[in-house]
Every structure is written in C-alpha cells, then in structure tokens.
Amino acid sequence: METATLVAIFISGLLVSFTGYALYTAFGQPSEQLRDPFEEHGD
C-alpha cells in the first residue's frame, strides 16, 4: 500500500475511535459521574 493511504486509514481510525470514546463518555456508564451545571444552578 501507498504511504498516503496508510496515513489516511490511520487518521480515520483515530477519528472514529475518539468519536466512539466521546459518545461512550457522554451517554454510557461514565456519564453518571458527570456533573450538570444547570441542575446545580437552581432558581
């Protein structure tokens, strides 16, 4: 394979991995530990 193809596949894989981790953190099991600033600011 050509170098440019390998670099493109590597960067695409990193982007997909980062997006998956961000979605897991936002909506998965760890999201219960996140604080909600709107709930803390009760009017």
From Swiss-Prot:
Family statement: Belongs to the PsbN family.
Domain of life: Eukaryota
Transmembrane segments: 7-27
Signal peptide stretch: none
The keyword Transmembrane helix is annotated on this UniProt entry: yes
CC per GO annotation: chloroplast thylakoid membrane
Designated gene of the protein: psbN
Membrane disposition: Single-pass membrane protein
Pfam families per UniProt: PsbN
Record GO biological process: photosynthesis
Function: May play a role in photosystem I and II biogenesis.
Name by which UniProt lists this protein: Protein PsbN
Keywords, alphabetical: Chloroplast, Membrane, Plastid, Thylakoid, Transmembrane, Transmembrane helix
Subcellular location: Plastid, Chloroplast thylakoid membrane
